[in-house]
Amino acid sequence: MNKVLINDTTLRDGEQAAGVAFSVEEKIAIAKFLDAIGVHEIEVGIPAMGKAEQEAIANIVKLDLSANLLGWNRAVIADIQASIACGLQRVHISIPVSAIQIAVKFHGQWQVVLQKLHDSISFAVDQGLFVSIGGEDSSRAEESFLLDVVLAAQEWGASRFRFCDTVGILDPFTTHAKVKQLVASLTIPVEMHTHNDFGLATANALAGTKAGALSVNTTVNGLGERAGNAALEEVVMALKHLYHHDLGIDTRRLLEISQLVASASGHPVPPWKAIVGENTFAHESGIHAHGVLQNPQTYEPFAPEEVGRERRLVVGKHSGRHLLSSILQQHDIILNHEETQFVLDAVRQESVEKKRSLTDQELLHLVQTKQHFRAC
């Protein structure tokens, strides 16, 4: 596999999630963190939105980060001028390429689409900018028309094409076939932009890289429009462990940036969230916990420390005597077989009542209570 780059769009598509609104300070903090962990490119926002967005972007540009910075634009010269005014040297130009999008936005006049694309690319290239082109709704576009558009964009000076599964309707097999055809026909690299409407954003992004795409759009925690985007932490760790492709990103800080974005967005990370969720390395059931105590690889695909997490062994409804005894021994409590079973029955009952596993403090309190009860 050729080197794949991450172009994170948390500050653009991530913030477009309903109800999310980053402050200037939060956007700067997120950009600095993405850069610090080694993300290659950051889509910093939409300059044409207005003064507040432009202020945030201009301040990020002034940080002189190692990551390349990209502004999102429509195929409108005024948009590109706004990007230039912010100090950006790389622009992304989005244009609809499916029949339904062109019908709604350009009354079906595909010639207008091509003209606007030509004019905007030409202007940006004349200004010495790196130009990325995005085919909005590429996944539903007629394939021959899509190829014609991208070949034209390539001829006019575009440096990259973003294949957008805008409404998240692809599966990995179809994604691979479509992207492979594009890669074979182009000399410029293809970038993947996938949405999670059917829970396949990360899978489709990976399929695109297998087909030859050299860049992937991600967002931290999968934040984004509707069901979200391909999650940065998922794409990075999947490429590392499933495809043995290390991107040079400091994965040990993935939990930190996840928590930063969760706080800034006002959307907590679900416990079962892949890679960074609280339960990702938590073990309760007896069989699993026993295996992990013997060898963590029995029930963990990689070490929790790789993403900044720690392994947690917790007691609850599904726990067994071995796990319970192991946790109690860590607190210098040793029970005989009968006592252990007595406490385990109580743990299971309380777990059902609380609808969760028990904390260590709750377990110790329960042991003290039950021992006192039996002594009476």
From Swiss-Prot:
Domain of life: Bacteria
Gene3D superfamilies: 1.10.238.260, Aldolase class I
Enzyme class: transferase
Signal peptide: none
Single GO MF descriptor: homocitrate synthase activity
Reaction catalyzed: acetyl-CoA + 2-oxoglutarate + H2O = (2R)-homocitrate + CoA + H(+)
SUPFAM superfamilies attached to this UniProt entry: Aldolase
The EC number(s) this enzyme carries: 2.3.3.14
Residues in Pyruvate carboxyltransferase domain copies: 4-255
Pfam families documented for this protein: HCS_D2, HMGL-like
Entry function: This protein is a Fe-Mo-cofactor biosynthetic component.
NCBIfam families: nifV_homocitr
Name of this protein: Homocitrate synthase 2
Organism of origin: Nostoc sp. (strain PCC 7120 / SAG 25.82 / UTEX 2576)
Chain's gene name: nifV2
